[in-house]
Each structure stands twice: as C-alpha cells, then as structure tokens.
Amino acid sequence: LSIRRQRQMCIRDRRRREIHKGDCGRILIAAGSKGMAGAAVLSARAAFRAGSGLVQVAIPVELFPIVQTGIPEATCLERDFSKIDLSRYDAAAIGPGFGKGEESVKFVKAIIENFMGPLVIDADGLNIVAEQCLFEVLRARKKGSTVITPHMGEAKRLLGENLSNRKEIIERLIKKTGAVTVLKGHETLVATEESQTYINTTGNPGMATAGSGDVLTGVITSLLGQRKPDGSRISAKEAALCGVYIHGRAGNLAAEAIGEYGLTAGDLAYYTAIAIKKILE
C-alpha cells in the first residue's frame, strides 16, 4: 500500500486553542557522542519542528555547550541512566550518533528494558542490539511500543545475513525484533507483524545526506509523544507511517526551494514544519 493514502493519519486536525506544551509531548532523545553532537541537535530540532512541546537530550556532559547552542529550545541531561526519571517522558529515542562503547551498551540495554513508553531505536542503538544480541530483550517489550529505523546496512547487521530483497528483509526484521519496522531507502518501507507493507512515495535523491536519518528519528519520536484531539495517543504504526511521509514531503519542499544537490539534514528539519502546515491546509 502507498503511504500517500495514510498521510493524514495523525496530522489531520488543528490544535485546540487551550492546548499547553505538556499536551504536545515530553520526549527524551539519547543521542550524540564526541564528534557526533550534530546527530543530537538534528533529532531534537526535528522533534520540535514536528510539534513536540518539550524535548530533553541525554548526552555526555562535554557536549552540553554544543547542543545547547545548536538547539536552545531543548534541555540537556547527563547521560547517566541512574539520574534519568523515565516516567516523565511520553516517548523516547535512542541511537543517533550514540557510539558503541561500554557505557553506550549499558545505556541502550537499560532503556530497552526499563522504558515503558513508545521507543524509537536508530543507528548505533540498532548496531548495539545486533552486536549484543539484545533481540529477546527487545521482543519482551510491550507489543507495538517499539519502532526501529534501519537502513540496509543496519538491517543486514541485525539479521546477520547479506540479503538484497527489501520485502524479505523487512519481514524477517519484524519477526526477529517484534518492532514496527521502517526500512529506509528509496521508497522507504514500513510494516508491522499485523499489517501489510507500506511503500513511501515522498522524497528525492537530495535526502541522501548525512543526518537525514537523525531527522526522521526526531519526527517519529515527536509524533509518538503527542496526543490526538480526542486525547488518545498516536500508535507506533501511525507515527511511523506519518513520520516517513512528512520526512519525505519535507525533502520535496526543500528540493523545490534550493535544489537536490545542496540539500542538508538541517533543511529537512526546517521544512518538517512546513510539510505539516501543507497537510493541514
């Protein structure tokens, strides 16, 4: 099925006049490491552009100045699991630019085991799952509460096989992880254990740029943390479908404005808000 048909699944109503930032979602993004602080900035920026009310970024203390300068709307937390109250968050993401050191491994495992809300796992978060064989821990999470967003390289590492058929890959990833799966690439695929596979029709070659996946992680996590006008939460499947569509639509709007060759992940984050505005028109 084409994701285009699902584009207004979770962005279909204007916000209530009496809404407050708590209604718009409090999310945690665990991202960034030495030399990769930009991943945290891009994910957090995209989350705000997608509508989050509050975004907190868990990063190494030495990165605080970079991240707080790059995204002043976000607040920074020391990446120490014992100091983070997970009950405060409506949704969380882990992995962009995260690193794979010993402390990173412990943090990823702790988040997967202890965070009860919807969780997006990307990049190094997925690499750690693959290298540490955390599949049982992942499958033990509440059904429908996890979204994974691998590109083909990460997908092959998760499966431990060099496959090329994307339909087969996404089906095997779902079986192995139990997660809503977003297989990134040209015509990104989204699927769950219960659903058909959806194909995204938005996007362009200009989005093949560093940080594009970090932006997608921020968008999906943001949607997971928000409420619909009736007060209900957006499901992981809805957030993945809508997030992928918005991400591609933002890329198309950016390409229309500046062309594909010079498009950056920062442009994708900026145009995320405009993409949502277009959906609401």
For the regions a language model picked out, list residue spans one by one.
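Small-residue (G/A/S/T)-rich helix-start motifs and N-terminal tracts that mark the onset
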Residues: 5-8, 12-119, 127-147, 152, ...
